[in-house]
Amino acid sequence: MAEPRQEFDVMEDHAGTYGLGDRKDQEGYTMLQDQEGDTDAGLKAEEAGIGDTPSLEDEAAGHVTQARMVSKSKDGTGSDDKKAKGADGKTKIATPRGAAPPGQKGQANATRIPAKTPPAPKTPPSSGEPPKSGDRSGYSSPGSPGTPGSRSRTPSLPTPPAREPKKVAVVRTPPKSPSSAKSRLQTAPVPMPDLKNVKSKIGSTENLKHQPGGGKVQIINKKLDLSNVQSKCGSKDNIKHVPGGGSVQIVYKPVDLSKVTSKCGSLGNIHHKPGGGQVEVKSEKLDFKDRVQSKIGSLDNITHVPGGGNKKIETHKLTFRENAKAKTDHGAEIVYKSPVVSGDTSPRHLSNVSSTGSIDMVDSPQLATLADEVSASLAKQGL
């Protein structure tokens, strides 16, 4: 029983290296070959619409039973009848849960039995090339034509209820399709980046080997030589000068005012005495009549007396109205009524028409008043 155990381990270790197209006849894989021979029957079942893609759990359980059947055939206990029974059990487990009529099931079993191939010569389990199997399911896409094992070949009964999740996890079933197997299981190694031609940014590697020399600087304390120092602006020319302010002596001497002379000759009349007390004020009457002369000869006519007071204004009564005569003799008599109320209320004849047609104006009072007014106005004007 140790040999089947060892072969089962080899299958588990090399499950990732199996190819889909490489199917070889090896010892203990007659059940896989039987399944390959039944490809036509499975395709016919798919065309009829009966088969469906199995679930991952069904396929995993089928591979577990397949591994057990292979181990039994190794021991020599397997026969044609047992192989047939194992094939029936595998197809029942690997097929989906869809129901099918019993007639089709019998036809699939009948076609599967004559398609069996004779067992291949046994090979030692320690051979360099691990056994390969193309009948793996669980990860293949349902639409790929090269994966017949992914779809059910014959209708089968529902999967057995007793399943071991631990054994399912142990058996590895990579996908059948070559594209999915290469992309998922065999990931290409990522090439390492070429770091020889990598350049740093902003030329930082140009001074990569530079070592700062700050630590090599020595600070030496030297005394300053001030012998050749020259002062600014010639201040050193009088460096030995000693101020003489300390030797000055302040001597107090009285001021001699005997020879002092006053300004502006004020001392020349210092002995002068004012003689204002001896002045006498005399009052004399001035004779303006004899000595004083008027300006512009105004005194020449000082004795003139205007003669305006001797003038007389004479008034003469004009009688030209009374003496006036009309140019034409119209034969009417002019009656003059005096404004003075008198006893005689009869109208008075102002004029009499002469034979020549002239009017006698001797007795007209209006003309007399007019003459008086004219003479009065002339008297006012001084004529």
UniProtKB/Swiss-Prot annotation:
According to the UniProt entry, its GO molecular function terms are: microtubule binding
Stretches of Pro residues bias are at 116-128
Q: Which residues are reported to carry the modification Phosphothreonine?
A: 53, 95, 111, 117, 123, 147, 154, 159, 173, 345, 369
One family from Pfam that matches here is Tubulin-binding
Positions modified as N6,N6-dimethyllysine?
105, 253
Q: Which residues carry this modification: Phosphotyrosine?
A: 18, 29, 139, 336
GO biological process assignments: microtubule cytoskeleton organization; neuron projection development
Q: Which residues carry this modification: N6-acetyllysine?
A: 105, 167, 201, 223, 232, 240, 253, 259, 263, 273, 285, 289, 311, 327
Record keywords: Acetylation, Cell membrane, Cell projection, Cytoplasm, Cytoskeleton, Disulfide bond, Isopeptide bond, Membrane, Methylation, Microtubule, Phosphoprotein, Repeat, Ubl conjugation
- Biased composition regions of type Polar residues, renumbered to the chain: 343-358
Modified sites of kind Phosphoserine: 127, 133, 137, 140-141, 144, 156, 177, 179, 204, 227, 231, 235, 247, 266, 294, 298, 338, 342, 346, 351, 358, 364
The record's InterPro entries line, in alphabetical order, gives:
MAP2/MAP4/Tau, MAP_tubulin-bd_rpt, Tau
User: Per the record, which residues fall in region Disordered?
Assistant: 1-198, 340-359
The principal location of this protein is: cytoplasm
Q: Which residues carry this modification: N-acetylalanine?
A: 2
Biased-composition ranges for Low complexity?
Answer: 129-156
Q: Residue ranges under compositional bias (Basic and acidic residues)?
A: 1-27, 72-91
* UniProt crosslink position (Glycyl lysine isopeptide (Lys-Gly) (interchain with G-Cter in ubiquitin)): 44, 196, 201, 209, 223, 240, 253, 259, 263, 273, 285, 289, 295, 311, 317, 327
The domain comment in this protein's record states: The tau/MAP repeat binds to tubulin.
Assembly with partners or alone? Interacts with MARK1, MARK2, MARK3 and MARK4. Interacts with SQSTM1 when polyubiquitinated. Interacts with PSMC2 through SQSTM1. Interacts with FKBP4. Binds to CSNK1D. Interacts with SGK1. Interacts with PIN1. Interacts with LRRK2. Interacts with LRP1, leading to endocytosis; this interaction is reduced in the presence of LRPAP1/RAP.
Q: What does the function comment of this entry state?
A: Promotes microtubule assembly and stability, and might be involved in the establishment and maintenance of neuronal polarity. The C-terminus binds axonal microtubules while the N-terminus binds neural plasma membrane components, suggesting that tau functions as a linker protein between both. Axonal polarity is predetermined by tau localization (in the neuronal cell) in the domain of the cell body defined by the centrosome.
Q: What is this protein called?
A: Microtubule-associated protein tau
Q: Which organism is it from?
A: Papio hamadryas
Which gene holds the coding sequence for this protein?
MAPT
